[in-house]
Every structure is written in C-alpha cells, then in structure tokens.
Curated annotation (Swiss-Prot):
Contains 4 disulfide bonds. Here are reported disulfide bonds proposed in [PubMed:16268797], even if the connectivity known for the framework XI is I-IV, II-VI, III-VII, V-VIII. InterPro entries: Conotoxin-I_CS, Conotoxin_I2. It is found in: Secreted. The gene is VITX. The keyword Transcription regulation does not apply. The modification Isoleucine amide is found at residue 59. Residues 63-67 form a propeptide. Expressed by the venom duct. This is Kappa-conotoxin ViTx. Pfam families: Conotoxin_I2. Disulfide bonds join 29-48, 36-51, 42-43, 47-55.
Amino acid sequence: MMFRLTSVSCFLLVIACLNLFQVVLTSRCFPPGIYCTPYLPCCWGICCGTCRNVCHLRIGKRATFQE
C-alpha cells in the first residue's frame, strides 16, 4: 500500500510541475531590444520589430520604381 501511495504522489507532483511550466511558457514576454511579434509580446513598451519604448517613424527618401 505504501508503494502505491508513493507512486500516486509522484505522478501528481509531475502533473503539477508540467502545469506550472505551461503557465510560465505561455505567459512569456520579451525585454527591450529583443525581436517581437503580436503573438510574442514585449514585457513593457511596444513592438516595433523589436521591443522598444517608442516606435520612431523612418523619414527619408522613398524608393523609386526602376524599369
């Protein structure tokens, strides 16, 4: 009976650990400077290709069509 109780306890402990890892991995976010997407969000700031505090607009020459 003692062996059965121990194996059931170990089994339940493994299930609890797997649930904990799932919560940690699914709520993962990225710090500033790391690549991000809408599905892999930034911990703080906003996603501009990489996690940043502010997205800066790139102003410059526009590309021209060449034939």
